[in-house]
Amino acid sequence: MGKRDYSPFGPDAKRAVESGLTAAEWYHTDVPRKVMKDLMARSDRPAIRDTVLLYGLMLALAVGGILTWGSLWTLPFWLAYGVLYGSASDSRWHECGHGTAFRTSWMNKAVYEISSFMIMRNSATWRWSHARHHSETYVVGRDPEIAVMRPTVLAKLMLNFFGVFDVISFVPKLIHNAFAGPTRVEKTFVPQSEWGKVQRVALIHLALYLAAMALAVWMGSILPLMVVGLPRLYGAWHHVMTGLLQHGGLADNVIDHRLNSRTVYMNPVSRFIYWNMNYHVEHHMFPMVPYHALPRLHQIIKDDLPAPNLSIAAAFAEMWPALKQQLKYEDYFLKRDLPASAKPYREDFHLYVPGIMAPNAAE
């Protein structure tokens, strides 16, 4: 395939459309309709429980950090607060953006807006970028949420464990959105009817961040920014760690989530922070199944999926060598083995690279 162009205006995006890749039908494991209906049933109870616990912990940790400010005892409070602010907000943004976390619509919307502010994402633009991520997952030039591009820029990945590049890219976008609406790239996936909302959201976010900075200046202390803003940097490591494992080192330009997504078994604390998104093949295959039902879905369809990685460490041990290989060979990827009970991958399509050869299925 050669060097990839991730721009939505580049040749890879054009080839993806012309080849039919963007309109292709994705593989789904067969699940009985009655079972799927039960899995997709929404409930307020699990999300209310988890949300009260999350915000309760954040409040307690922030109070502890404020009361111990100026001493070393303050550090553990802010480190824990930061992970909940800078990482748990990512999964809440994600699930509530799908509208599946709560049964009650306004609850999804409220938590989605709060989480979008915390994770430094415009709630209007990112709702649409994530829709594209699901419809064209890791299709080069089309998916705006490809976290691990080829070749991998390892320094950028490392710095993003502290949210550095996310924040650097957020600030100019925030200012552009606030005063000029969506950027040129954002206009490729955000409907024109939403452009005004993009600007309104950006103005609100900008006002809140300016207020926090003004309070910090008035107090002569960074304490207000330890509560709002800075946790997006010092607490980002968990959501970056888990986010890299979603698709890192796997195939791009395919239509089978078993090839481009990864399920990883995680400890209960990480699963709470990540809201069960460690079941990532399952989530991409059936995105309308709520987070609390993903463990059940996994048990039902696991015989049709690659074996999950047994831990975060095991997943990184698998992914890291692949990322290093991609520094030299952009077309290298890990192909996950399927159990004997699974339906096979469609080799005719998965060997296809847009622009190089025509897929056998289309001949």
Task: Report each predicted region and the residues it spans.
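Non-catalytic, topology-defining segments of multipass membrane proteins
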Residues: M1-G82, R92, F117-L225, Y291-E363
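Short acidic-hydrophobic sequence patches enriched in Asp/Glu that either
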Residues: P46, F102-A110, T125, G229, ...
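Active-site-flanking alpha-helical
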Residues: L61, G97, A101-F102, V254, ...
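Membrane-embedded alpha-helical segments that form the functional core of polytopic membrane enzymes
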Residues: L67-W93, A110, I114-A124, G229-A236, ...
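Transmembrane alpha-helical segments that form the membrane-embedded catalytic/substrate-channel core
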Residues: V83-W93, N122, V167-K173, V227-I255, ...
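Histidine-centered catalytic micro-motifs
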Residues: S89-G99, W126-Y138, T242-G249, I273-V289
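Aspartate-rich (DDxxD/NDxxD/DxxxD) Mg2+/diphosphate-binding motifs
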Residues: S91-A110, Y138-I146
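Active-site-proximal inter-transmembrane loops
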Residues: V185-S193, H257-Y279
